[in-house]
């Protein structure tokens, strides 16, 4: 199957999304109502924040999370999703091991070509039905509808009994374990019909790009259930959902309900501007937004600690290479990399939490020493600020300059628009500075902020000139996931789900100094094999190809500046030096994990 699937947030993955109405009121949050018995009779509440769209734009189709989800699902693109529909396990980034949730164990048999997951017994859904292996099969077949990358490895699915799932594969994939264990499991009662339709296509040898697959994909994008059947310790209190906040209430029969310590989780809706005021007023206990550097001292004065976990990703400059032939010329992209001062962009966006990308290989600088040999690192071009090189490359590509202004190879005035999610304070500041730097160089770029839910959709449809979207991935340390974000999520393979080509960089028959390559194949191979040394070779090929071609231009690597309010309503946030702080906040979130452990608790008294 060709690798065609849809985003995040990230990651996404990788980032924050919302559509906050112009009239949102965030300065006076409503007091949450009680939703549980509590130890002392009074309900306890944790106050978090995450951007979402209320109905009708927002919905409860939690399918194919976290790697190929449907856009605008309420809380579906963030860490609190795991408290509603838990995955099999969460990954401990420092310890490099799994902490099981729904799963009891797992085993990868390379010679037999199977990944077997044993499910904890006696798990139940909020509708009263048992959670079984059939729900896992449904989940994976629904991922096929969303063109999830896992289906480049999966060759079959089996459920020998109610608590055993077997995933079959051909080439042992290093990353399949992550795709399987991190999948948020869906209820067959809610998604069984969709899973059956996908299974029929799989068994017939079909794809999502033809016949029944195309119709199924179209139908599924329109599936917007009124609620979600959950298996985790919390469920939505649907009556509380407004444009400003919602409440999650304890699901007493869900997995982890015996360990989580809060009766309610109050989630305030909003992007950075709205949530900043709520942090300053002490209404939020923890938030992961990209806060403006100027906010940090007021937060600390209000009693907050600033947590700075690595995010392992950040914003990149996307160029519409399908629409503008000058952007399709690698010399132009290299010139842009040389002319942009990435350190300044990161400093303006996030101060010490915005670190300029150094190696420009498509994945976090934190992992370069783990995956690339000294020989490979010696081949990397770091694209350090060099306006002379930028000028030379543009001239070589046919650009000309009249006075202080550049013209494209076609003789047109070099004038573009860069779009970015307006409500992301860090990306907004970065986008404006990118426009200023281009202007100082003689290329006119107009900055335009968009609704942050619409911005990635516009990129997928090709309705942009320049744009800020994510590079890298918070989903797992393995570089494969970063390459998927860089090359597939807003490019031809996955943008297809929105009917476009994204930034329009072809992945097949790509010319490099090493010869003609198939980047889609290279990315897939970067996740194959169980021998680490073999994986390093594949990762090196992908890293060098990215570094030479710069399909997108990474700008800075983001570190969290997450305010945590210890000792008022909540206690148990990790301290500096705690290895759990190496967990990516948008993937295996340390606060969510500590909630499952019962280590984030209400303040007594």
Regions found by a protein language model. Name each.
Residues 49-110, 141, 229:
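N-terminal lobe/hinge region of extracytoplasmic solute-binding protein
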Residues 120, 248-298, 444-446, 451:
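Ligand-site clamp/hinge motif
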Residues 5, 10-26, 37-42, 46-47, ...:
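Detector for C-terminal structural segments
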Residues 104-147, 160-168, 326-328:
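Aromatic- and charge-enriched surface segment that lines or borders ligand/interaction sites
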Residues 92-93, 185-257, 264, 387, ...:
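Gly/Pro-rich hinge or "lid" segments in bacterial periplasmic/extracellular proteins
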Residues 42-55, 104, 114-117, 139, ...:
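Short, well-ordered beta-strand elements
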Residues 47-49, 132-138, 162-168, 233, ...:
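Alpha-helical secondary-structure segments
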Residues 151-213:
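Surface-exposed binding/hinge segments that line
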């Amino acid at each position: 199957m060709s690798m065609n699937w849809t985003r995040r947030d990230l990651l996404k993955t990788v980032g924050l999304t919302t559509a906050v109405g112009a009239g949102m009121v965030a300065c006076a949050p409503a007091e949450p109502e009680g939703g549980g018995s509590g130890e002392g009779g009074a309900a306890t509440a944790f106050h978090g924040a995450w951007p979402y769209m209320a109905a009708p734009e927002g919905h409860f189709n939690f399918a194919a999370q976290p790697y190929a989800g449907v856009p605008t699902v309420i809380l579906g693109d963030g860490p609190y999703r795991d408290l509603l529909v838990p995955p099999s396990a969460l990954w401990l980034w420092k310890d490099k091991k799994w902490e099981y949730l729904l799963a009891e164990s797992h085993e990868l048999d390379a010679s037999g070509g199977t990944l077997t997951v044993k499910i904890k017994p006696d798990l139940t859904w909020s509708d009263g039905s048992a959670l079984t292996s059939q729900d896992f099969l449904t989940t994976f077949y629904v991922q096929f509808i969303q063109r999830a990358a896992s289906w480049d490895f999966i060759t079959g699915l089996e459920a020998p009994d109610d608590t055993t799932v077997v995933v079959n594969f051909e080439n042992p994939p290093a990353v399949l374990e992550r795709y399987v264990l991190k999948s948020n499991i869906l209820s067959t009662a809610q998604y069984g019909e969709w899973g059956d339709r996908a299974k029929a296509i799989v068994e017939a040898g079909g794809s999502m790009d033809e016949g029944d697959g195309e119709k199924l994909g179209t139908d599924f994008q329109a599936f917007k259930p009124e609620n979600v059947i959950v298996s985790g310790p919390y469920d939505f209190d649907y009556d509380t959902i407004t444009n400003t906040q919602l409440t999650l209430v304890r699901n007493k029969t869900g997995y982890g309900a015996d360990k989580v310590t809060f009766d309610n989780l109050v989630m305030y809706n909003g992007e950075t501007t709205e949530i900043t005021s709520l942090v300053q007023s002490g209404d939020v206990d923890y938030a992961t937004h990209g806060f403006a550097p100027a906010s940090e001292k007021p937060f600390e004065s209000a009693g907050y600690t600033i947590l700075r976990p690595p995010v392992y990703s950040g914003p990149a400059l996307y160029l519409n290479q399908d629409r503008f032939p000058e952007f399709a010329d690698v010399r132009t992209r290299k010139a842009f990399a040389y002319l942009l001062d990435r350190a300044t962009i990161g400093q303006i966006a996030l101060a010490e939490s915005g670190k300029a990308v150094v190696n420009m290989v498509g994945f976090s600088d934190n992992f370069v020493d783990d995956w690339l040999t000294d020989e490979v690192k010696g081949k990397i071009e770091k694209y350090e600020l060099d306006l002379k090189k930028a000028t030379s490359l543009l001239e070589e590509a046919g650009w000309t300059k009249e006075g202080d202004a550049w013209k494209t190879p076609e003789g047109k005035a070099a004038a573009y628009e860069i779009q970015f999610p307006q409500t992301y304070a860090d990306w907004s500041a970065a986008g404006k500075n990118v426009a200023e730097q281009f202007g100082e160089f003689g290329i006119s770029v107009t900055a335009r902020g968009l609704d942050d839910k619409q911005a990635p959709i516009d990129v997928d449809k090709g309705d942009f000139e320049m744009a800020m979207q994510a590079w890298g991935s918070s989903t797992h340390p393995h570089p494969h996931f970063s390459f998927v974000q860089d090359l597939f999520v807003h490019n031809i393979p996955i943008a297809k789900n929105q009917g476009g080509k994204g930034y329009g960089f072809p992945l097949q028959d790509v010319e490099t100094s090493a010869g003609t390559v198939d980047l889609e194949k290279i990315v897939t191979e970067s996740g194959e094999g169980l021998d680490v040394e073999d994986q390093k070779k594949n990762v090196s090929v992908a890293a060098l190809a990215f570094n030479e071609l710069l399909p997108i231009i990474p700008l800075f690597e983001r570190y969290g500046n997450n305010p945590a309010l210890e000792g008022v309503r909540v206690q148990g946030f990790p301290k500096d030096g705690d290895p759990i702080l190496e967990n990516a906040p948008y993937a295996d979130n340390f606060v969510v994990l500590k909630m499952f452990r019962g280590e984030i608790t209400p303040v007594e008294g």
